[in-house]
Amino acid sequence: MSNNSRHYSAIDEAILQGQAMLETLFGKPVAQRENPAKGLSQPALTSAEKKQSIGFMRVNHSGEVCAQALYHGQMATAKNPAVRALFTTAAKEETDHLAWCQERLEELGGHTSYLNAFWYTNSFLIGLLAGLSGDPLSLGFVEETEKQVEIHLADHLRKIPSNDLKSRKIVEYMQQDEIQHGLNARSSGAKELPYLVKKLMAFQAKVMTTLAYWI
């Protein structure tokens, strides 16, 4: 989405959001930064190890699909141009993650989640609601989301085969970006979310990570 002060009509906004959805779900994402795993050799994985790596990288890819949807929903409803710019920058970095995960999945011979259209739609609606609740709570939603994502990624680093250095390097870089996104949201005026909202977010994330691992 635009990070300038231009005002879009409802129709313009709908077209832009539809385009963003189609690009995320059906396009080939282009990273602005170099893949951190570039130059690393392909590991010799057993069939079981490869299946495990595919599962976790598929989860990470779906997580990035959700991140794109969340940020676009929040961008569409952000009131402060500075907050909108923060979401725009974060979304661009999440596009890097999306591209890296998709590239790694292709290298492993895996497929992206067949449920990505559902993940995107659900996350976009959540992003809209978060944005409509006001910028402080919307920023709080980002901060809490990134905290939970960082925990998931740390868990993945414990479970991805130790010799799959390519997948591990990508996840490590993603983890650092997510931590920074959370810190940026906090420094921009994030308001802490209610406990029940945090628990609901964790439950939804658990559903996504469980299903995306297999489907």
Curated annotation (Swiss-Prot):
Q: Which GO biological process categories is it annotated with?
A: ubiquinone biosynthetic process
Give the domain of life: Bacteria
Q: Which UniProt keywords apply?
A: Cell membrane, Iron, Membrane, Metal-binding, Monooxygenase, Oxidoreductase, Ubiquinone biosynthesis
Give its localization.
Cell membrane
Cross-referenced CDD domains: DMQH
GO cellular component terms, semicolon-separated:
plasma membrane
One Pfam family here = COQ7
What pathway is this protein said to act in by its record?
Cofactor biosynthesis; ubiquinone biosynthesis
What's this chain's function? Catalyzes the hydroxylation of 2-nonaprenyl-3-methyl-6-methoxy-1,4-benzoquinol during ubiquinone biosynthesis.
Q: What is the name of the protein in this document?
A: 3-demethoxyubiquinol 3-hydroxylase
This protein's species is: Coxiella burnetii (strain RSA 493 / Nine Mile phase I)
- Name of the encoding gene: coq7
